[in-house]
């Protein structure tokens, strides 16, 4: 009897987990994109600030931002699935939502493969899981093609600037270092013990990067690096580039666009065409 009871309990839990989610809330921009990629777009009823892709996401009610989440409003919306960013959304507020019995799915992509895996996992909540499977498989195929293409390329040293004041960069193992690594880049601060270290201008100059990358949030073309003319290879060779921030910093299918952009720039640096 005990075996039968356990079997019924496990089977019931499995069945519930596979039921399509009808009311979904996303608490970060990247989980919003992943939801659409997994076929959950029609089920989304609210999202976080800066959830701006695809265009349909811009019409969703806002229930989260960098300061936290609107707990009372989220509960009132009665979601059957909440998509959260592990490490990005406040743990205490997430715990409260779980204590209230709400179903919270945590996304925390670390490797490029994690994007495809997360899409497949979210697809289990979609009425059309085949969309998630197809999207994930296509992503894996494109990643595999880039790996094959770049495996014998010359390594290019680079510095990626997240912000101007203070100067923040990324270490190996932190998103989006995987994109640069796939394209044959060597992070000059890859060995930092901090995931997102704060560095000085002098530290960057000492490590002599061939390329400096920034985003529109850190306008490297007209910033401090131009003051180091003659001392920085990246500046002397005009290898200071601005990348599309959302492609690069959000772990979503659009990461492929970031890979194409970064790999293309590295190729031109290697070939001497820039």
UniProtKB/Swiss-Prot annotation:
GO biological process terms on file: cellular response to iron ion; cobalamin transport
Highest taxon above the source species: Bacteria
Location within or outside the cell: Periplasm
CDD domains: BtuF
Role according to the record: Part of the ABC transporter complex BtuCDF involved in vitamin B12 import. Binds vitamin B12 and delivers it to the periplasmic surface of BtuC.
Recorded family membership: Belongs to the BtuF family.
HAMAP family on file: BtuF
Protein name as it appears in the record: Vitamin B12-binding protein
């Amino acid at each position: 009897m005990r075996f039968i009871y356990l079997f019924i309990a496990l089977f019931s839990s499995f069945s519930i987990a596979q039921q399509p989610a009808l009311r979904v809330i996303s608490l970060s921009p990247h989980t919003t994109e992943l939801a659409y990629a997994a076929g959950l777009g029609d089920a989304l009823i609210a999202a976080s600030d800066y959830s701006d892709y695809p265009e349909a996401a811009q019409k969703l009610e806002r229930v989260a931002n960098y300061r936290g989440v609107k707990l009372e409003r989220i509960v009132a919306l009665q979601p059957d699935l909440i998509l959260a960013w592990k490490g990005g959304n406040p743990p205490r507020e997430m715990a409260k939502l779980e204590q209230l019995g709400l179903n919270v799915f945590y996304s925390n992509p670390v490797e490029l493969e994690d994007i495809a895996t997360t899409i497949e996992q979210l697809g289990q909540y979609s009425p059309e899981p085949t969309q998630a499977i197809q999207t994930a498989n296509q992503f894996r195929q494109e990643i595999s093609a880039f790996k094959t293409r770049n495996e014998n390329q010359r390594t290019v040293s680079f510095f990626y600037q997240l912000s101007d004041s203070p100067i923040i960069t990324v270490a190996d193992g932190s998103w989006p270092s995987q994109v640069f690594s796939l394209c044959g880049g060597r992070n000059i601060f890859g060995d930092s013990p901090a995931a997102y270290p704060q560095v000085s201008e002098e530290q960057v100059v000492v490590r002599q990067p061939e390329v400096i990358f920034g985003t529109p949030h850190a306008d490297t073309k007209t910033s401090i690096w131009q003051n180091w003319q003659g001392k920085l290879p990246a500046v002397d060779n005009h290898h200071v580039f601005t990348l599309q921030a959302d492609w690069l910093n959000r772990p979503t299918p659009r990461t492929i666009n970031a890979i194409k952009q970064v790999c293309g720039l590295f190729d031109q640096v290697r070939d001497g065409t820039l």
